[in-house]
Amino acid sequence: NRFEQNFLRSLSRTFDVIGTDISETATDYENSVQWDFHNVNPAWSGNQDFVYTNSLDQSWQPHVAVETWLSQLKENGILIIEHTHAHGPSGASEMDPFGVKPTVMPYVLTMWFGSQISISHSVAKKSNMDKDSWLFVLKKNQHSVSLIKSDALV
């Protein structure tokens, strides 16, 4: 419904906001492009101050999606992932296959990216829905050291 895209555009005229959608109707909306968020767009790589998404639950390859979004960020850029309890296991479906509770999301992200990212979050109600919305803010760390090997505990 483009609520978030319009809201972010209303915050400032100093940055551009575009929306992406995989559907063919994406270009029917102002400032929207048709794009699969799993795919890297070389023009966007390393050029974005922030990436916002509320679509991670719709991903068949959520790790790839987050990796792609992180690759689009400038140095000191942030990735904002909106997630609700409706995106958890009980809300998972063919259209929304990634069913992870928001309370588990930091652990999942840490398993995927380890010390490559820093994570913070906040919980609030959005003005267009009457349920808690979790905002996870991810930032790529400049120098990261992995303390855990994937095949064994150290």
Model-derived features: where do they sit?
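Core SAM-dependent methyltransferase catalytic element
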Residues: 111-154
